[in-house]
């Protein structure tokens, strides 16, 4: 009887221990699953925050893709962010170009190509356009990637409106992410640049439409480079891009932060002379036609060498640049006090661009 009682007691203890072990194991399993869940959530959060950059770093090897119809697509979000945020454009060294015609002009130009770091990373094409049209443009903008068979991705009208930032997408056939050419600091630019004789400098020109128009005009009149001063609008801003018609990719550009840096770069690197051929557009100054004739008739290596500085319509050029430059003005017999900066720049570049 005692043996039986002892056996029952041992059996009870074993059962109790097993139940405890099972309960403990279940708790551990729950904690393990909970930890895995937290880790997974953290991973997903990190993955989401990095998705826009990942979308840009992918080389689009996926080939043909279904039409994108959602504005929440990660590639769509990236394109919108590139279009609207300068800091993101600078960080990614890329921008958004709208219009198949502009893209063709950019990539058919002999002035640059992949050697200058400009390439098409990805492109969206409206689903309204036929495949023959798409393939013709794709062959040009992806010309160095035939081995990867990269091609544009079709998108809905809703997505195209979002990416291009327009109210009506009927006339927008293409939107592409294109890498930006480098805008060098002024001193570095003039150390590397060769045969820079005609320069246009924008000192605080903030309107993107004016900046784009001035870039386009500078290219048209054969200017060699465009300088961008403090507070000047980003030339890769969507409106500036639209106005420049791709000139911002073909023109050499440099930037400066202080007037000291500006003049040091021009004089030491560019061999310009302040108060001689560094010319500031002012309301009061020498007649621009007389100055153009004088500088163009110099019997020396400096013949025709000129740097034109334009300021904002509201405040003009900065004080330091005004004091160290040669003031010139456009003769206007009418009663209008001043001209739009893009119009004034066009007149001056025509006068000195001969």
Locate predicted features:
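Structured adenosyl-cofactor binding patch, chiefly the S-adenosyl-L-methionine
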Residues: 174-176, 217-221, 232-249, 318-354
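RNA substrate-binding interface of SAM-dependent RNA methyltransferases
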Residues: 142, 152-153, 177, 181-288
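N-terminal mitochondrial targeting presequence
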Residues: 1-53
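Short, aromatic/basic amphipathic alpha-helical patches
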Residues: 132-146, 320-321
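A glycine-rich helix N-cap at a beta->alpha junction
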Residues: 145-164
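Boundary-proximal intrinsically disordered activation/regulatory segments immediately upstream
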Residues: 33-131, 232
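Active-site/ligand-binding-proximal alpha/beta "capping" segment
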Residues: 281-336
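Amphipathic alpha-helical repeat scaffolds
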Residues: 99, 206-214, 338-344
């Amino acid at each position: 009887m005692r043996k039986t009682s002892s056996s029952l007691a041992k059996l009870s203890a074993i059962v109790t221990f097993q139940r405890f072990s099972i309960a403990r194991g279940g708790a551990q399993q729950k904690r393990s699953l909970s930890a895995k869940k937290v880790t997974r959530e953290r991973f997903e959060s990190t993955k989401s925050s990095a998705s826009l950059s990942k979308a840009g770093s992918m080389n689009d090897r996926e080939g043909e893709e279904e039409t994108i119809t959602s504005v929440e697509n990660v590639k769509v979000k990236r394109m919108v962010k590139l279009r609207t945020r300068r800091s993101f454009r600078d960080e990614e060294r890329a921008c958004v170009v709208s219009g198949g015609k502009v893209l063709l002009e950019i990539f058919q130009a002999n002035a640059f190509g992949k050697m200058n770091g400009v390439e098409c990373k990805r492109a969206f094409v409206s689903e309204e356009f036929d495949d023959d049209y798409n393939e013709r443009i794709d062959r040009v903008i992806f010309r160095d990637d035939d081995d990867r068979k990269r091609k544009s991705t079709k998108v809905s009208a809703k997505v195209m409106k979002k990416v291009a930032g327009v109210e009506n997408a009927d006339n927008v056939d293409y939107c592409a992410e294109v890498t930006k050419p480098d805008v060098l600091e002024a001193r570095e630019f003039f150390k590397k640049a060769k045969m820079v004789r005609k320069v246009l400098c924008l000192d605080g020109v903030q309107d993107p439409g004016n900046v784009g128009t001035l870039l386009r005009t500078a290219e048209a009149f054969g200017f060699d480079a465009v300088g961008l001063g403090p507070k000047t609008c980003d030339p890769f801003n969507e409106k500036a891009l639209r106005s420049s018609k791709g000139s911002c990719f073909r023109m050499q550009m440099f930037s400066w932060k202080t007037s000291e840096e500006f003049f040091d770069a021009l004089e030491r690197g560019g061999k310009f002379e302040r108060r001689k051929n560094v010319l500031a557009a002012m309301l009061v100054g020498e007649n621009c036609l007389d100055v153009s004739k004088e500088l163009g008739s110099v019997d020396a290596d400096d013949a025709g060498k000129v740097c034109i500085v334009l300021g904002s319509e509201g405040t003009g050029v900065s004080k330091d640049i005004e004091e160290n430059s040669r003031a010139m003005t456009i003769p206007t017999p009418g009663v209008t006090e001043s001209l739009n900066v893009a119009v004034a720049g066009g007149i001056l570049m025509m006068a000195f661009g001969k």
